[in-house]
């Protein structure tokens, strides 16, 4: 569903509209969580997502978020707003569309993050309980 925002921005959850090259460029070259990720892997991750939401300004993709999971647990990944578009509340709107306005609003969500904790706390995220375990990726 497309949602207009002020300042010429819009949110859209249409997977066909996602600019995979734009996502790949940011995630592979500018993120701390997936430097060097191949375009093929990025394309597969987007194809396997249960929900994607992108942020556009005048038709150009300037933000993105992806969710994987099922009706019981959703994992939030690859969330970004390009640096030149930050500081306008767009990250809040991107997450609101992804989490609160989507079909998984009542589902348990998880994420890994090294920054933006205050932003995620606005959507109910907090430290994981002692019952959560993680297996690191093998290299």
Language model features with spans:
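A conserved beta-strand-loop-helix scaffold within acyl/acetyltransferase catalytic domains
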Residues: 42-58, 63-79
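Active-site-proximal cofactor/substrate-binding loop regions of enzyme domains
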Residues: 98
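Conserved GNAT-fold acetyl-CoA-binding loop/helix
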Residues: 14-42
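Conserved N-terminal entry element of GNAT/NAT acetyltransferase domains
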Residues: 1-16
């Amino acid at each position: 569903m497309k949602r207009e925002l002020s300042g010429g921005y819009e949110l859209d959850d249409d997977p066909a509209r996602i600019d995979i090259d734009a996502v790949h460029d940011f995630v592979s070259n500018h993120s701390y969580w997936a430097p060097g990720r191949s375009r093929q892997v990025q394309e597969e991750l987007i194809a396997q997502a249960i929900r994607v939401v992108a942020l556009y300004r005048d038709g150009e993709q300037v933000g993105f978020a992806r969710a994987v999971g099922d009706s019981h647990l959703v994992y939030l990944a690859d969330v970004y707003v390009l640096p030149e578009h930050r500081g306008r509340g767009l990250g809040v709107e991107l997450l609101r569309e992804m989490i609160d306005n989507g079909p998984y609003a009542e589902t348990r969500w998880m994420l890994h993050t090294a920054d933006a904790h205050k932003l995620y706390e606005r959507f109910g995220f907090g430290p994981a309980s002692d019952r959560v375990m993680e297996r690191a990726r093998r290299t």
